Amino acid sequence: MYGRSGLDRFKKSQTSEPFSVSANPPPVVQQHLSPEALSGQKTQIGAGQSNWHPPDWAIEPRAGVYSLEVVKDGQILDRIHLDRRRHIFGRQHQTCDFVLDHQSVSRQHAAVVPHKNGSIFVIDLGSAHGTFVANERLTKDTPVELEVGQSLRFAASTRIYLLRKNSEALFSRPPPPAEIKLPPPPDASDEEAVVAYNTLLNRYGLSNGESGGMLGKRKEKTGSEAGVAKRMKKVRVSFRDQLGGELAEIVGMSDGADVETEPGPINVKEGSLVGKYESLVRVTLIPKGKVKEEKAFTGGTRGGVTDRLQEAMNMLKRGPKTGIYDDLYGGDSLAKAVGTSWASVSQPAAETECGGVGEEDDNDDLFGD
């Protein structure tokens, strides 16, 4: 029925225990990839001839600070250093900077761009299967910050890119050259040369003792001069007279000395600088205390006096009025309009014996004393 070969397989299946679990299972063997296998799984470098331009805020960062750690199945495969102004990831070798060999990755998939504020941003370039930052899919042409330690994935690729930052590279000093050619020590009297020489030593991280025996001998001879130069270096503000010069004379107030009060430079002919410094000079008079007003006002208009008040003051200065109601009806204007008026004062026709008394009555006030 089974045949010879089929019977042998049937007997073997009865004797074997394919689903049995032993008490001591064999240890799991971890596979370690050889360097040759790892080199085959490293990210390929493309030609980088894409026409895509990064935003204006993109900069070229300092080398060695940021990098992408390529991880697959818990094993680090590669490390991509982010030291360019743009890093385009995709499947096309000619246009991309880093080539991803996966069928779900677009030709120009995404770009990693350093920001001028020191952070890293990821921009999706319209990929078909998406770009993911911390398992969140990005919107097309929308920059999203990739923080340190977050994951970056492209489409259905199983590779995970983790952002790493090397803070020591930000403040690391460049290694000093193997041989340093220093000029001979300058003369101590030349202060500018001494400062330039000390600046050169500080640039290479050297002290005066390490720069050579000749400099050490010079330091022993001119120890006091070096102390003076050090104190002068600490002074932030220096005046011309401290360096052997002369200060320019400034016209102004002095302690009882007679000085000129006219503004302007010294030893310059009057009128030669007209129009150059005229706008810089302004004279303001500030009176001390209250100034008594003049009792007599002669001509002109005082400040704060209206035209109507000025007209009333001018009418008072014309002398005595011809009528007792001239102030109310405009004085002469009413008399010219109606001729002789009852408001005008008529002269007496003839003098009587009581003429003296009449003159006194006319001179008296209307309402009496």
Swiss-Prot record:
Q: Where is the composition biased (Basic and acidic residues)?
A: 1-11
Q: Keyword annotations for this protein? A: Protein phosphatase inhibitor
On whether Lyase is a keyword of this UniProt record, the answer is: no
Domain of life assignment: Eukaryota
Which Pfam families is this protein grouped with? Answer: FHA
FHA domain boundaries: 87-138
Keyword Transferase in the entry? The reply is no
Ranges for the region named Disordered are 1-26, 345-369
Q: Which regions are flagged for Acidic residues bias?
A: 358-369
* Biased segments, Polar residues type: 13-23
Extract the InterPro entries matched here.
Answer: Cell_Proc_Reg/RNA_Proc, FHA_dom, SMAD_FHA_dom_sf
Which cysteine pairs are joined by S-S bonds? none
Q: How is the subunit organization of this protein annotated in UniProt?
A: Interacts with human protein phosphatase PPP1C.
The entry's function note states: Inhibitor of protein-phosphatase 1 (PP1). Binds to and inhibits PP1 activity.
Name this protein carries in UniProt: Protein phosphatase 1 regulatory inhibitor subunit PPP1R8 homolog
